[in-house]
Amino acid sequence: MAQLPRLSRLGAPSLWDPASPAPTSGPRPRLWEGQDVLARWTDGLLYLGTIKKVDSAREVCLVQFEDDSQFLVLWKDISPAALPGEELLCCVCRSETVVPGNRLVSCEKCRHAYHQDCHVPRAPAPGEGEGASWVCRQCVFAIATKRGGALKKGPYARAMLGMKLSLPYGLKGLDWDAGHLSNRQQSYCYCGGPGEWNLKMLQCRSCLQWFHEACTQCLSKPLLYGDRFYEFECCVCRGGPEKVRRLQLRWVDVAHLVLYHLSVCCKKKYFDFDREILPFTSENWDSLLLGELSDTPKGERSSQLLSALNSHKDRFISGREIKKRKCLFGLHARTPPPVELLTGDGAPTSFPSGQGPGGGVSRPLGKRWRSEPEPLRRRQKGKVEELGPPTAAHSRHGSREQRALQASVSPPPPSPNQSYEGSSGYNFRPTDARCLPSSPIRMFASFHPSASTAGTSGDSEPPDRSPLGLHIGFPTDTPKSSPHSVTASSSSVPALTPGFSRHSPPSPLCRSLSPGTGGGVRGGVSYLSRGDPVRVLARRVRPDGSVQYLVEWGGGGIF
């Protein structure tokens, strides 16, 4: 098992011992290769890393973190250490010019110098304020931000509240998408760092900006992934402390929220009701803040959740529909539950899944995304008939089995700054089952008892699994050939499936049944002519772009 990432945050940047830049004839650069820096992530926290490459054209750096992962980070999200000899150089404008009323002030923690007007909010002159020492905005946020919510008491909590009354960027100058979920500048929250709207962020009802959980000081419990059932107002809009109110949830919202949170944490689609959904809900019952539902007796919670999962077919899919255990449940589309908020005039406004108050365009995880429709197929007594492109009626009323077979969990689209595993802040029941460490491309929780290393539960989805369930590229325990099995080759689907590696070696089972062998396509014609039953077991895409199907004839089982 691969070692889990080891993440580190430094509250005092003055502890760094940065490498010196290579001597040059020009001015000393702010960032260079080999420099130790703090990089702000999509969760609002700072992580220690080393710069590997600097791209001045795009203003990004390739940063290697302590878990040996490397990602591109924007210059604005990188905090380097102060260098000797730069005590009289402003770290914002890179100027030493001093005029009356705009003097240079040094931070007590990081030793960076700021012009009074370059710092947001305006820095006090030396000797002014409550104390003789002064701490900059970067250091205050580095110390006060925490998973689950920032500090609420103490001098740094009070200093952070004062900093949060103004933003370090121009809110009106941000270029937002139609759903007001992401902006081109990747500037969010009070810290100005990157973010992902569905990964533990709150949206202000007034300015519509998104704020990290780690930077807020109003939460009593940690957020779940995709939990937007809050009415939140930021410090900038209120001119003082934040205000938050929990919205009332229905049982269908609870089931949807729990399933979405588990799917993001565990990177799989289906979850066992008795072993995963109900235990997670029960152990975190108080943290869910369910309002009127919180008084529900323990004996009724199971029946209420199960009724919501079974009665809302438009949101949930059960294992019975895909010929698995009936106690398995998953989401039809991995999007957060829809939320109904009150606008400024008091009228309720519904925000469907994947949408925000700024528009009505649905886009999963805040990115533009559209899947190409696949031709519909119909099974008739031993043959698969091609029906051509799907019509609107077929799209709405297609068979449940066909939708279930084609359903797969789409990974979040990567952004320049999306990646770390963090503690979810919620309890998971320890079991004997072990889980794979999360891929460093997503910010997911690391442990959950249902994530198996070998897919033994039958409902997990390894990264290199085809949509129909065949574990491509890994040896299997199944026989290399079967008298009732055949693969049908096709080139009608040229595109690779998400998560499929074009260079993955084929499994021994499919390789032994490729066309031209004793079990080729020609051998299946006789089965079709006799009207024997046929079942498509799996599909794979070969390096040349052709598609092969693993077909079972005669009703025999090989797994």
Swiss-Prot record:
Q: Which InterPro entries match?
A: KDM4-like_Tudor (IPR040477), Mtf2_C_dom (IPR025894), PHF1_PDH-finger1 (IPR031202), PHF1_PHD-finger2 (IPR047010), Tudor (IPR002999), Tudor_PHF1 (IPR047399), Zinc_finger_PHD-type_CS (IPR019786), Znf_FYVE_PHD (IPR011011)
* Keyword match Repressor: yes
Q: In which tissues is it expressed?
A: Testis-specific.
Q: Which UniProt keywords apply?
A: Chromatin regulator, Cytoplasm, Cytoskeleton, DNA damage, Metal-binding, Nucleus, Repeat, Repressor, Transcription, Transcription regulation, Zinc, Zinc-finger
User: What Gene3D superfamilies does the annotation carry?
Assistant: 2.30.30.140, 3.90.980.20, Zinc/RING finger domain, C3HC4 (zinc finger)
- Zinc fingers (PHD-type), renumbered ranges: 87-142, 186-240
Q: Which GO terms describe its cellular component?
A: centrosome; cytoplasm; ESC/E(Z) complex; nucleus; site of double-strand break
* Function as written in the Swiss-Prot or TrEMBL entry: Polycomb group (PcG) that specifically binds histone H3 trimethylated at 'Lys-36' (H3K36me3) and recruits the PRC2 complex. Involved in DNA damage response and is recruited at double-strand breaks (DSBs). Acts by binding to H3K36me3, a mark for transcriptional activation, and recruiting the PRC2 complex: it is however unclear whether recruitment of the PRC2 complex to H3K36me3 leads to enhance or inhibit H3K27me3 methylation mediated by the PRC2 complex.
Q: Which proteins does it associate with, and in what oligomeric form?
A: Associated component of the PRC2 complex. Interacts with p53/TP53. Interacts with CHMP1.
The domain comment in this protein's record states: The Tudor domain recognizes and binds H3K36me3.
Family, according to the entry, reads as follows: Belongs to the Polycomblike family.
| Protein name (Swiss-Prot/TrEMBL) | PHD finger protein 1
